[in-house]
């Protein structure tokens, strides 16, 4: 059930391959895993999970190649016009975010888990970064290094590509603002995973945890989700409509787009 369970922060802990640290440090190569995977496919009746995993091996190499192609991406947005989107940063809210003290239980639980284990599944990584860039409206250049320090599987090419994608600064990917309440309900309906990581909520009903309407039962929220999401959408789409933006996006697509046809 790799395809189904990989989205859940609790289920993915045992259903994902957990090979990423080995790829990062070279103790196991992607080539070894790829060859072993191809050897195993003919022996299986249900091949969907392995095919899904195989795609992610391709993506690994694709994202790493982006940074090799353009090393400046460590500091500059893939779409250069996006560097003017977020120019100021707030150390106080960034610190609360990285420690898991934002006032949103599911997000904070994910950050507590990541701080403790050095790993969390892809969907939650995307949600964490999306919140920092859209709801907190912080420059990805300030939040990305702090997040990178937490990962035992930190791979610069993948990390920076995903950070920029979840921050809406690639120019070729649609902006995606994750709903914290929806992810909370979808990924941890009972709220038990959250309560294990945030024991102060052990006696709180799951529906209140998901809605984050906890009043004095939990930490104050550092942002208003609806207001901050609207602000971010207006800002991002405000520049995406211009002719100049589309021309620059075309350059990015030709250089980095994964669906570009090659002779």
Enumerate the predicted regions with their spans.
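C-terminal catalytic domain of photolyase/cryptochrome flavoproteins
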Residues: 5-263
């Amino acid at each position: 059930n790799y395809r189904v369970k990989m989205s859940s922060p609790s289920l993915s802990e045992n259903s994902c391959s957990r090979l990423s640290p080995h790829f990062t440090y070279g103790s196991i190569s992607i080539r070894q895993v790829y060859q072993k995977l191809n050897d195993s496919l003919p022996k299986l009746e249900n091949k969907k999970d392995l095919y899904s995993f195989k795609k992610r091996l391709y993506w690994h190499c694709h994202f790493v190649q982006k940074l090799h192609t353009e090393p400046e991406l460590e500091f500059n947005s893939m779409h250069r016009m996006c560097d003017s989107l977020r120019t100021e940063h707030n150390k106080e809210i960034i610190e609360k975010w990285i420690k898991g003290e934002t006032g949103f239980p599911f997000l904070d639980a994910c950050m507590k888990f990541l701080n403790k284990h050095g790993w969390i599944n892809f969907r939650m990584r995307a949600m964490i970064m999306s919140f920092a860039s859209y709801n907190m409206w912080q420059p990805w250049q300030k939040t990305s290094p702090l997040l990178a320090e937490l990962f035992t599987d930190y791979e610069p090419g993948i990390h920076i590509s995903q950070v920029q994608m979840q921050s809406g600064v690639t120019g070729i990917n649609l902006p995606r603002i994750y709903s914290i309440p929806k992810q909370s309900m979808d990924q941890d309906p009972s709220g038990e995973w959250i309560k294990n990581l945030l024991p102060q909520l052990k006696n709180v009903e799951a529906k209140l945890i998901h809605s984050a309407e906890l009043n004095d039962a939990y930490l104050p929220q550092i942002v208003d989700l609806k207001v901050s999401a609207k602000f971010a959408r207006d800002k991002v789409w405000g520049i995406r409509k211009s002719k100049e933006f589309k021309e620059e996006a075309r350059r990015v697509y030709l250089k980095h787009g994964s669906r570009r046809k090659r002779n």
